[in-house]
């Protein structure tokens, strides 16, 4: 039933709710799965990718190259962070999209300023700190995998010098040649995260 009216079940559903996936949305997805509706990227896959740390943990258990990552909470022990992750470092909120909640910190002063700003705004949430992969600053690859097969690749590239390559932040997308490494990494990521697409 939708708004009290009986409706025919869809043949399939491809949830595209991203970081906005709420408990309510997940409950609907699980309900439809249990009714036999085919889900493209079902509830398990959504659980795997909605939380950036959880995704990182899944990928980190494999032989895939992943950046060193820490989960921290307020108050943050700066010395402990610096022992494990060198500057520059990337700081992220656990969920988010379009480059929001992602910051590059180049030194201890910037780190302390960002943490102070978080404290002043009562942002006492957990954050991820990652090593900066300097070769990828301002660009990243997006690999399209469908049912385990790599079918396309694009490079997102910042055009204004930002370290983030998000299209919504003014970046551009250009076709990118698939090689063996890209095919293997893309396919493995999709497999490990249980993604259909």
Model-based region annotation:
Residues 1-9, 21-22:
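Glycine-rich, highly charged phosphate/nucleotide-binding loops
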Residues 4-8, 32-36, 40, 44-138:
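Active-site nucleotide/adenylate-binding loops and adjacent lid/helix of ATP-dependent enzymes
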Residues 14-15:
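Redox-cofactor binding/interface segments in oxidoreductases and associated redox assembly factors
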Residues 18-20, 95-96:
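Short glycine-rich anion-binding loops that position phosphate/pyrophosphate groups of nucleotides
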Residues 25-31:
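A short acidic, amphipathic alpha-helical/loop segment
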Residues 28, 78, 186:
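Aromatic/hydrophobic pocket-lining residues that form π-stacking "cages" and hydrophobic walls in ligand
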Residues 103-189:
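Phosphate-binding site of ATP-dependent enzymes
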Residues 194-196:
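Phosphate/ribose-recognition catalytic cores of enzymes acting on nucleotide-derived substrates
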């Amino acid at each position: 039933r939708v708004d009290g009216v009986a409706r025919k079940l869809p043949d399939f559903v491809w949830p595209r709710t991203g970081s906005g996936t709420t408990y309510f949305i997940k409950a609907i997805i699980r309900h439809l799965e249990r009714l036999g509706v085919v889900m493209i990227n079902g509830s398990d896959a959504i659980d795997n990718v909605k939380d950036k740390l959880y995704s990182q943990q899944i990928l980190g258990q494999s032989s895939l190259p992943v950046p060193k990552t820490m989960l921290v909470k307020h108050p943050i022990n700066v010395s402990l962070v610096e022992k494990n992750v060198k500057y520059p470092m990337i700081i992220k909120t656990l969920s988010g999209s379009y480059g929001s909640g992602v910051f590059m910190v180049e030194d201890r002063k910037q780190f302390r300023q960002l943490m102070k700003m978080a404290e002043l705004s009562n942002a006492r949430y957990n954050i991820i700190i990652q090593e900066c992969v300097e070769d990828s600053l301002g660009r990243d690859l997006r690999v399209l995998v469908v049912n385990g097969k790599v079918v396309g690749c694009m490079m997102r590239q910042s055009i204004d010098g930002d370290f983030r390559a998000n299209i919504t932040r003014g970046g551009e997308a250009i076709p990118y040649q698939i090689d063996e490494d890209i095919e293997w990494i893309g396919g493995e990521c999709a497999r490990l995260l249980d993604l259909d697409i």
